[in-house]
Amino acid sequence: MQSGTCESFQSLSHQRNDEEAVVDRGGTRSILKTHFEKEDLEGHRTLFIGVHVPLGGRKSHRRHRHRGHKHRKRDRERDSGLEDGRESPSFDTPSQRVQFILGTEDDDEEHIPHDLFTELDEICWREGEDAEWRETARWLKFEEDVEDGGERWSKPYVATLSLHSLFELRSCILNGTVLLDMHANTLEEIADMVLDQQVSSGQLNEDVRHRVHEALMKQHHHQNQKKLTNRIPIVRSFADIGKKQSEPNSMDKNAGQVVSPQSAPACVENKNDVSRENSTVDFSKGLGGQQKGHTSPCGMKQRHEKGPPHQQDREVDLHFMKKIPPGAEASNILVGELEFLDRTVVAFVRLSPAVLLQGLAEVPIPTRFLFILLGPLGKGQQYHEIGRSIATLMTDEVFHDVAYKAKDRNDLVSGIDEFLDQVTVLPPGEWDPSIRIEPPKNVPSQEKRKIPAVPNGTAAHGEAEPHGGHSGPELQRTGRLFGGLILDIKRKAPYFWSDFTDALSLQCLASFLFLYCACMSPVITFGGLLGEATEGRISAIESLFGASMTGIAYSLFGGQPLTILGSTGPVLVFEKILFKFCKEYGLSYLSLRASIGLWTATLCIILVATDASSLVCYITRFTEEAFASLICIIFIYEALEKLFELSEAYPINMHNDLELLTQYSCNCVEPHNPSNNTLKEWRESNISASDIIWENLTVSECTSLHGEYVGRACGHEHPYVPDVLFWSVILFFSTVTLSATLKQFKTSRYFPTKVRSIVSDFAVFLTILCMVLIDYAIGIPSPKLQVPSVFKPTRDDRGWFVTPLGPNPWWTVIAAIIPALLCTILIFMDQQITAVIINRKEHKLKKGCGYHLDLLMVAVMLGVCSIMGLPWFVAATVLSITHVNSLKLESECSAPGEQPKFLGIREQRVTGLMIFILMGSSVFMTSILKFIPMPVLYGVFLYMGASSLKGIQFFDRIKLFWMPAKHQPDFIYLRHVPLRKVHLFTVIQMSCLGLLWIIKVSRAAIVFPMMVLALVFVRKLMDFLFTKRELSWLDDLMPESKKKKLEDAEKEEEQSMLAMEDEGTVQLPLEGHYRDDPSVINISDEMSKTALWRNLLITADNSKDKESSFPSKSSPS
């Protein structure tokens, strides 16, 4: 027993390859030859080109039946020449075999792969106690082990396997018992069938059959089980669910698997072709002639009563259950040492259908696979490693699919060989296998392993060059008047109701509260600046009213309700220029503005009618990122600028002398040389300077009367204010830091997942709430948010409606079309660039977009605001990006150690609608809003600007300038584009961004939209500096007029390649060239040449000779 590493596998040789378990649905098949019939190969081409073909079609059935006969014929041919499966044709690699297996079409749903939960149980013997199976490890995606103390699970980690254990596992599958598509209802039936097969094949002596059966039926102890198993009523209900689902005609709610009825279970045929389904003969003579084959209701009851009582009420780990995907099935690995065995017992079982076996798995889901490995004492660690190997294989994406679709043991062996062909070996002298490897953040796709190679040496589904991100049907010209708008309405109308029902989530509440605070301040600030520029004709109350009305209409009827409307800098510049022009020429500002607004709305509607939004496809990532980066930088810059401006309103004494604090004072005195404006204001107010007691005035009174400040505690224009500026700085940076920290709280190690998720969703709102409470508690008079308290126009000489002509000459209505053209470009570019950024494919939006409908709503509301004398509002880039980021959906069901998958965005209309409804109601909430410090809102602006920069490729490329090549991240474009070309692309983009910034902050800001439009032409000129392939990786490809013709040509070429195949047989591309390419090897053949594998085979051959001299005691069935 101790003579060799492989001695425990002596009995494996008794099961020959020709003694396969018979699949219940018919023939087996082999893919060891590469000369496939053309009809066969056609059934797999659909997989190669990635087209999903529904299962169960008539053609599929006919082709599958035909293929089954040919597979059986090939089986016989293969078995005659390759009996033990040790050698295969040199031109047939495991990858080819696996790709053929995965291309098989099945007539039922039993072989459709499901997610798998794998559990490793080992049998434990203790003195004075009954043996039991103890859970030692589990896999959903990564391995988790029960720690040595037995009290807790380890952190998930990437399983590292020894090559020796993988070879031993291959030997187990190759020589052990393989039972595929077994029909069974209970674990006892499974054990009966496995042991019957073992005995009939001479792999197990009949005199120990009963003891092995008893060992398999021992109770299972799982890590989550405690001594008191009936403390929680809900646990008992789960056990009851499991109990009911194992009864006849019941359905598993988790996996949707029907449990087999009480009909006599079908089993595999033995070598005498005696069907288990039609016979109740004694397969269990080793158990004293007891009847095991026939299952009567009475027998079922007796077995149930014999089962361990704790399985009825065992606990279920509800937290772990949430991580298991719906429809998942279980794979149970049972390994251990039995003192009465002198040979190893190995079995691989696939159940059909999956059955819920009470107490076997840690969680109540149906079991699909079982792997049993029992052997003599002294090899426990070896068995454990083999169990880990098969469990890890079951979590491998490719072998997992092979296990579901395998028709015989050779398919399973091919799956193992393909896995060995893909593994990475760590040198033993440079790595400690006991070190647990942390799960990676991003797991590479395994699709390439499932796809065959094509003649040019690339994969059929290899990495395709990325194409433009905005070439969908939404941007195709219809050639009809308002054709694009009609299609937008048809596209969005079916989702209108779901846009409201999908908002029933705490995430939407968090997004709404956060963005309400974020939107309020810029709207009020914009209104205040507009009031200063227009002498109060349009101010804060008009800005609030206009934003609320426009936002509500857009959120209800817009094509992309995730877009948030707001005020923009170029609009403010335009308003200043227009007001100055009207004042110089004596024109009515509001009337001329109404005329310009109506012309702008009309021009935008004409753009909608002519499908002009289709031009958006020329706005590539180059333009998007330059525009978005500029807006983000403006947010950051203005947040810091507002903070610095507080130093003027709240100055500090930079030359303090602590010894002279008792002499510090600041008094208000009469100005020595009052200005003419001051004297005029005094006369109009009937104020005499000599009558004023200047020393008794407050700071606000002294400032309003234009008094002067005198004293050591006085600044240039104001008294020094203690603490306010420094406190504002603390509030500002505390807001930024706390917002970022709480947003990342979802990935922290503290508190349960639900708590972390809620804190992350409400991060900014909680930050604002905390800062308001702290500011209120400290009591320092920091500047607060000022909201108008009365709903009426700022000036009494204007109403809520403005006539376009008014007192202006009639020709001004016609002349207004000239500035309206500029405004139209401004509105169109701002709106559509933001919409393009929101609608990018990376956001995985499912309800479609509506560029034409968006522009129509903005145009209509712009006309309404013009008539009512309200500010114009258009898509706000940073607010919209922040809105999208706050509504990101991640998979709730992720395996331990696996990063949650990004699923998309919660697309709905409610958050935007509620933001603007509450904004309009803010006039009635001034008593609450007056407690919000302005530095906190400035901090929120900085956080929004900085967080919106994440994911912008432009800034990732800027970082590359200061990184050595060996430390650069593995960006996909760095693999395909030379670094100097990447830097050149970045420099050009930085130059354009710098030019935009200069124009934005200068008096030429009115032409800012024209410069954004010019970026499109700059991008077009870059075609002369970069190849098309380089631009496809660095940027989106520009659309071309011949694109459709090129696509048609590619399709014709693909069809011609398929037509070149002969009518007879089709040969795989590697045939005839395999030996010419030394880089291509057959892992199965190369493995058979290794000393390790030969040692295993020699041991197996010796075992055959030994067993031939000691025939099995079992009688033939």
Curated annotation (Swiss-Prot):
PTM sites of type Phosphoserine: S88, S275, S1056, S1084
Compositionally skewed regions (Polar residues) per UniProt: 1-14, 247-263
Residues that bear Phosphothreonine: T93
Record region (Disordered): 1-26, 57-94, 244-312, 456-475
Compositional bias of kind Basic and acidic residues: 15-26, 76-89
Family (UniProt): Belongs to the anion exchanger (TC 2.A.31) family.
Membrane topology: Multi-pass membrane protein
Molecular-function GO terms, alphabetical: monoatomic anion transmembrane transporter activity; sodium:bicarbonate symporter activity; solute:inorganic anion antiporter activity
Chain ranges on the Cytoplasmic side, renumbered to this chain: 1-508, 559-561, 617-625, 741-761, 830-854, 933-934, 1019-1117
Transmembrane segments: 509-529, 538-558, 562-582, 596-616, 626-646, 720-740, 762-782, 809-829, 855-875, 912-932, 935-955, 998-1018
Protein name (database record): Sodium-driven chloride bicarbonate exchanger
Domain notes: The N-terminal cytoplasmic domain is likely to have a high level of intrinsic disorder.
InterPro entries, per database record: Band3_cytoplasmic_dom, HCO3_transpt-like_TM_dom, HCO3_transpt_euk, Na/HCO3_transpt, PTrfase/Anion_transptr
One BP annotation, GO: visual perception
Residues annotated as glycosylated: N673, N676, N686, N696
Topological domains, Extracellular: 530-537, 583-595, 647-719, 783-808, 876-911, 956-997
Protein's organism: Bos taurus (Bovine)
Source species taxonomy: Eukaryota, Metazoa, Chordata, Craniata, Vertebrata
Primary role: Sodium/bicarbonate cotransporter which plays an important role in regulating intracellular pH. Has been shown to act as a sodium/bicarbonate cotransporter in exchange for intracellular chloride. Has also been shown to act as a sodium/biocarbonate cotransporter which does not couple net influx of bicarbonate to net efflux of chloride, with the observed chloride efflux being due to chloride self-exchange. Controls neuronal pH and may contribute to the secretion of cerebrospinal fluid.
Modification(s) after translation: N-glycosylated.
Gene Ontology CC terms, in alphabetical order: apical plasma membrane; axon terminus; basolateral plasma membrane; dendrite; GABA-ergic synapse; neuronal cell body; perikaryon; plasma membrane
